[in-house]
Amino acid sequence: MIKSKMISFYIAVMMIWTCTVKAQDDNKSLIHKIGFDVRPSYVAPTSKFLKDDGYGNGLTLRKAASFHLKYGFQQNPNSKEGQLYPHTYQGIGISYNTFGNRQEVGNPWAAYVFQSSRIAKISSRLSFDYEWNFGASFGWHPYDENNNYRNKIIGSKINAYINLGFFLNAKLSRYCNLLVGADLTHYSNGNTHLPNAGLNTIGGRIGLVYTLNPIEESHHEI
């Protein structure tokens, strides 16, 4: 009788322990997201090279565009971190950038880390959010006193990439969100190579974020 009760007790303890471990593991599961952005922009005329109307071969440097592919992860809403930062996610991204003047400037790629979160809730399906990007851009055609002497804004093939955006985040479904807003971008090398006037853009952005494994917050009754 006592032995039978002890066995039942141990079985109950093991079941509780197993459920607890499973719940803890479930709470550690991350939410994974894939995003795609298109960002048309205007190039700020901050130097003579950008202000001139003549660009040698009829090329202009007024408009720019970038195309972004991103992977992000978010904390489980049932974890401690997820409850502290319920709308924050971060990750890595790559982008292809064009300025309409490949000959003198190039069409660089960028690789970066990013973070996004909510600023204000507007409704149950709409919020006002921000996102920052920080990384490096590659593939520029830098200044060369013989072959690319007009380009005095970019002095190196690799430059820092910095971006800050604000946008409306609309929840289309459990899996998909639409992002529409505006952003600012800066490219430069921090004076590691001269000349380094840098390049700045301001523009719009539209994108989609797809959540691969949405996890709902658990509401426990007391």
Feature map (PLM): residue ranges:
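Repeated loop/turn-to-beta-strand initiation elements of outer-membrane beta-barrel proteins
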Residues: 44, 78-80, 170, 174-178, ...
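Gram-negative (and chloroplast) outer-membrane scaffold detector with strong preference
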Residues: 85-138
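Residues that define the transmembrane beta-barrel architecture of outer-membrane proteins
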Residues: 30-32, 61-67, 105-111, 126, ...
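Membrane-embedded beta-strand positions of outer-membrane beta-barrel proteins
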Residues: 34-38, 90-92, 130-134, 166, ...
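Extracellular loop and loop/strand-boundary signature of outer-membrane beta-barrel proteins
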Residues: 53-57, 99-102, 148-154, 189-196
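Transmembrane beta-strands of outer-membrane beta-barrel pores
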Residues: 38-44, 73-75, 94-100, 134-142, ...
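Short glycine/proline- and aromatic-enriched beta-strand/turn motifs that initiate or cap beta-hairpins
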Residues: 24-74, 213, 222
